[in-house]
Regions:
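Phosphate/pyrophosphate-binding active-site segments
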Residues: 136, 174, 192, 196, ...
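Glycine- and charged-residue-rich phosphate/anionic-cofactor binding loop of Rossmann-like
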Residues: 130-133, 356, 504
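Conserved structured core elements
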Residues: 215, 262, 317-320, 359, ...
Length: 555
């Protein structure tokens, strides 16, 4: 059948099982948006306040479901506004497809109105980017984009479509999309080698990363951890790959991880990294990271092997397939003394009492949210101290229930991510935990929450400062608080009301439970302005480039 390019875009989205897209219209995308109007009974479009919000929403949708998120924009600033969102998705291996409009093909390269070479701009922060100059190539390019986004190490792909390509017609033939190919183990001979290392280990430890969740391998991972009886230390992206209350779950690893995860890293004799990339926020001093251990890396991406930390053995392939292969023929291991030692480390700071404070403490707020929420409810975060408090204190019980910007550390990510997650999973509650600094970045997306009546609970940890940078200034820059005490006087309750959203405020510890309970029960968008002390810090902390021996526990 003969269809316009714009109609082909919509048909290809339907082929791929897309039911929701996030975006913002504009001149170069008018034909596509006109087609979306015709397809509105099949494809829901969520209009955000800003294209960056749309890109983060597509990201949140993808993280919450495992499906490919879709963002659509016009040319020029519409396209450049999603670069941060693509970079955020790229470093965290999140599958997105961005479809941008552009000027007509005869106007390309002429500095036309709202023309920008978005294809070259995003090359460093995408798996691939394509300019479609003929309508005949459009369908196959979009299909290729979706296949690339989900194949191997997942990530974002951009398709740039000039306006005349969306207007021109060509023959369109529907196809059934290929299922993502299984990424087979490339060096299967190493499976037996790693099994022998597991059998010989006395103090094994698993360093679990986001690759487990990306591969939908949480069940296989839990079975593997139980089989080898190894404690699990999770990166920020790996939280949720094993329930937080599982006996083998030790907690978050790295700069702001617990004492117990740092000691497990230092004292283990075998470290198995599953879908984790040894980032600087985890490894610290790379030369001394896991220095007593043989290190095994299980990963889908060959570029990650030995990139940050030198490993003794590695297996390349899909994490799910690797974990299944490692369990075959391997007897159950037992390490009671090692696990008892880790349990002892967990209680290393038990004698330290919570500081007395007239304002709510972050731990009190997060402990209360743990009590209120269900295991399948979703926590989204922005970036800053509140993000690290979530990693330390929130009980993440299932995969795909913690949405956070890991590698890029994108302030302003959380609002869009929460929107995308709530659209993707309307039957689960979504709570955004943010800070006043991050919230100021993309608070315009409150209009999106209200427009679609998305029942997201926004909890603002309001300390009136840029807390994480301020903490570093206190520790490493002689308490010279340069531009981190902004003296803003934003009334977040009134702000929420201005958008038509309910606002609540917490200023005392005894108000935490009743107000948060009320917020979660309202079943509509609500902002909770939770005042905390500007002197509340994220501890313990291992300074950058250091080891557990240099841990900071007090400030």
């Amino acid at each position: 059948m003969q269809l316009t390019g714009a109609e082909i875009i919509c048909e290809c989205l339907l082929e791929q099982g897309v039911d929701t897209v996030f975006g913002y219209p504009g001149g170069a995308a008018l034909n596509t948006y006109d087609a979306l109007y015709k397809y509105s009974d099949k494809i829901r479009h969520i209009l955000t306040a800003h294209e960056q919000g749309a890109s983060h929403a597509a990201d949140g949708y993808a993280r919450a479901t495992g499906k490919t998120g879709v963002v659509m924009t016009t040319s020029g600033p519409g396209a450049t506004n999603i670069v941060t969102g693509l970079a955020t998705a790229n470093i965290d291996s999140i599958p997105l497809v961005a479809i941008t409009g552009n000027v007509t093909t005869d106007q390309l390269g002429r500095d036309s109105f709202q023309e920008v070479d978005i294809v070259d701009i995003v090359k460093p922060v995408t798996k691939a980017s394509f300019l479609v100059e003929k309508v005949e190539d459009l369908a196959d390019t979009i299909r290729k984009a979706f296949a690339l986004a989900q194949h191997g190490r997942k990530g974002p792909v951009l398709v740039d479509v000039p306006k005349d390509v969306t207007a021109n017609k060509t023959e369109f033939v529907q196809t059934i999309p290929e299922k993502p190919r299984t990424f087979e183990i490339r060096n299967p001979e190493k499976v037996r080698v790693v099994q022998e290392m597991i059998k010989n280990a006395k103090r094994p430890m698993i360093y679990a990363g986001g690759g487990i969740i990306s591969a939908n391998a949480s069940e296989e991972f839990k079975a593997f951890a139980e089989l080898i009886d190894a404690p699990v230390c999770c990166s920020l992206m790996g939280l949720g790959c094993i329930p937080a209350d599982h006996p083998l779950c030790v907690g978050n690893i790295g700069m702001h991880g617990g004492y117990e995860t740092g000691m497990a890293t230092a004292e283990c004799d075998l470290m198995i990294a599953c879908g984790a990339r040894f980032s600087d926020r985890v490894a610290g001093d790379r030369e001394r990271f896991g220095e007593q251990a043989k290190i095994v890396q299980l990963d889908i991406d060959e570029k990650e092997i030995n990139k940050n930390v030198k490993v003794d053995e590695y297996i390349l392939g899909d994490i799910k397939e690797i974990l299944i292969a490692l369990t075959i023929g391997l007897d159950r291991q037992n390490h009671p003394d090692w696990l008892a030692k880790i349990e002892e480390w967990k209680h290393h700071f038990d004698d330290k009492k919570l500081p007395e404070c007239d304002l709510p403490l972050p731990q009190q707020v997060l402990d209360t949210i743990n009590e209120i929420k269900c295991p399948s409810d979703i926590i989204a975060t922005d970036v800053g101290q509140h993000q690290m408090w979530v990693a330390q204190f929130s009980k993440i019980m299932e995969s795909r229930t913690l949405l956070t910007s890991g590698g890029m550390g994108t302030m302003g990510y959380g609002m869009g991510a929460a929107i995308g997650a709530q659209c993707a999973r309307p039957n689960d509650r979504v709570c955004l935990i943010t800070g006043d600094g991050s919230f100021h970045m993309n608070l315009n997306e409150l209009v999106t929450l209200k427009s679609y009546e998305l029942p997201v609970v926004v909890v603002v940890m309001n300390n009136t400062v840029l807390g994480m940078v301020r903490q570093w200034q206190k520790l490493f820059y002689g308490s010279r608080f340069s531009q981190t005490d902004p003296h803003r006087a934003t009334d977040f309750v009134k702000l929420a009301n201005a958008f038509g959203v309910d606002g609540l405020r917490i200023t005392k510890p005894e108000e935490i439970k009743p107000i948060l309970t009320k917020a979660f029960e309202m079943n509509k968008p609500v902002v909770v302005d939770c005042h905390i002390s500007p002197d509340a810090n994220v501890l313990p902390m291992i300074p950058p480039g250091k080891t557990i021996n240099e841990i900071i526990t007090e400030m």
